[in-house]
Amino acid sequence: MIKLVSAGPFGLLAFVFITLILALPAPRATAAPVVTKPKTSAAVTVTDHGDFWTLDNGIVKATIGKNSGALWSLVYHGVETMGGGGYWEQTPEGAPQLTNSVTINPASNGGARAEVAVKGVTGGKFMLTPSAPGGGTYCDIEVRYAMGRDDSGIYAYAIFSHPTNYGAMGIGESRYITKLDHAFDWISVDADRNMLECTPQDWGNGIVIHAKEQRILSTGNYKNSVEHKYSYTAVQYKVPAFGWSSTKDHIGIWFVNPTIEYLSGGASKQELVCHFDANDDPDPIILDYWRGTHFGGGAQCSIAAGENWSKVIGPIFVYVNSLSSFKSPGKTDLATLAATAGNPTVPAAWKENATALWQDALRQAKVEQARWPYDWVNGVDYPHKDQRGTVTGRLVLDDLQAKTTKLPHLTVGLAHVDYTNSFSGRGGFRGGGTNGFGGGRGGFGRGGGGTNGFAGGRDGFGFGGGTNGFGGGTNGFGGRGGFGFGGGSRVVDWAHDAKFYEFWTDGKENGKFTIPNVRPGTYTLHAFADGVLGEFAATNITVAAGQSLDLGKLDWKPVRYGKQVWEIGFPDRTADKFYKGDGANYWLWGWPVRYGDLFTNDITYTIGKSDYHKDWFFEQVPHALSDAWKNPAAKDPLNQRFGWMKTGTPDEDMWETIGRGRATTWTIKFNMARASKGQATLRVALAGADGYGGLAISVNGHGVGIIRPTATEALRYNTDKGVWHEYTQAFDAALLKKGGNEMQLTVPAGELTSGVVYDYLRLELDENYKPDGTHVANSGL
């Protein structure tokens, strides 16, 4: 067929090409959906068209641009899956030296596999990728695409390299992304975000509220709801396959990560994975962040001058599947969908079809995990299986106050030893943009500016900018208190690292674990589990190529500051055990708006009587002052998932009316058998927080301190977790009296998306504490 394909964001090139492939057989209605099994033994071919290649195996046909390494087209049995196409945040395009090559020639292996590569060599000069929020880099970048016989998709990977003759540099936000055809209308992230999406037209008609990525929908199935791209974030470790499918064409397209070793932030890193683009006619998109900056996890990737560094990102498998037979909704189902617009009842047939495609993608993820590391990746720093090691051991909990010695949902990983990032110092504070690159979050561009210099922004090259230099900012080049060039040094731990590889696994309840396929090196072993407050760590774990290393019994003795008096919830690094923190609810936009009506008198929680599942809200935020958000047509505006929000008007941001609240005080009541002495310690584990004046703590009317947590954007981005932190507040135990006691936690007045997201609270008492004790009040762990 004749197909016009544009280069989209990768350039102005457009080309027409003719594909001669077998059409996908028309699917048929059936009692249960059935996934299509690939039926071909066609050899893989690679064809050079001058400005682009095509890779074809009779199932998929991929078109790759030879300047940018962009995926211009991915045709599956005659059906185009791409809209804007696929690309890396930083690309080789624009490098002083650009080469492209066929790195695996199918003519040499009987058509078993083909691979093409585009490499940009900067020569140590800065290479700016146009329009990339993550900015540019000094690194050499090589982008590769590979396809095997019978592969229902294509593998994409990138190699970032910094030779010893290059200067100091950092890498901003970085990811691989595909922008899809608008036929994809069903999003699948996890069991709770496996759903029909609004249409691109509905998004385009929506009214912005609070931020450009949030819109109140005024039309369609989800009218009177807020669509927000951050509603579809996920912990990357827990979603090995995610993507979109089409309710009409019965095709799915997915990103499959066979491992997270090349991703930042380890086994608890939350990132964007699927959502709509932000413009008025958006493509559905899939993203794979390897250097993510969201939710307080501004991962660090700063390389010193003269440092020899490289990292292989991927291969990621872009998997495409379809249904050979499917379930069809009845007329009654479609009528019900139309009648319930706003808070829709979606046809069960659509969900069964989409779930079948998603579950098949998850099965494919297990296949890819078993194949990892791929034996066909060569010529880069990528050890094969026999060049890697395996680490085993058994963690044993040593805690006399623990209810059990079991370690449910044990997660164990190996990460680079904590290190101080490469650069420190203080950058300038000029804004502007005179002869300089802009600023903004994530890197070059979007505001800021420095005279003759590269400006800044969060997570990129710094806030503000500097004269003739790299500007200032958080996590970037320069600025007060930042993390990168000129930004003030900081210790980088596993939860904030993107520079090195990490290796994580699920352990067993009895503490046993096996970590396979570890690159040779020296690591720190980390572990956390449900029910255990804190984290285990063991240093100097050296892994050799081909070695099986048994660490034996590892005693895990969690920190205690005294005898436990009471607890609320249990530690698991999420808010899912608290009211509305469960998977069906937490990700929905607007719980800070609705909190004040759910708990009109705020919260009073009585230890031993209250139930944290329903009596403790998962986030403590200011108490809203306005009900102007309520849709009068909503049946249950406080609890229904969709359709509860007034639309508002395009010329007014409703957030200006509803977005602030008064101070919120929660009270915890508890009894003591007798008056106390020594030191008491409140331990607060936070799954997330957003910038505000702190969490003020009082005991029986006496203020004892303020916890000032690290901002993780968990509230602004409506999630139940950011980077996890524990905070402690010690106080004189003499404040505790025999009989009834009250502790109050207060969030100050302010914007509704300021406050905390709770994981767990515990009060401990050490009656033998001496003033010269080592416990430091209000310390963050």
Protein language model features and the residues they cover:
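Short, acidic Ser/Thr/Gly-rich low-complexity loop/linker segments typical of extracellular
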Residues: 420-428, 432, 484-512
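A short, amphipathic beta-strand motif
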Residues: 389-399, 511-513, 554
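Structured interaction patches on ligand/partner-binding surfaces of diverse proteins
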Residues: 530-553, 557-559
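A short, solvent-exposed beta-strand micro-motif common in secreted/extracellular proteins
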Residues: 511, 521-532
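Beta-strand-rich ligand-recognition modules
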Residues: 652-653, 658-677, 685-780
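A contiguous, surface-exposed recognition patch within enzymatic or periplasmic domains that forms
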Residues: 179-309
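Extended, loop-rich substrate-binding clefts of extracytoplasmic carbohydrate-active enzymes
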Residues: 47, 90-163
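Beta-strand-rich N-terminal accessory domains
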Residues: 32-90
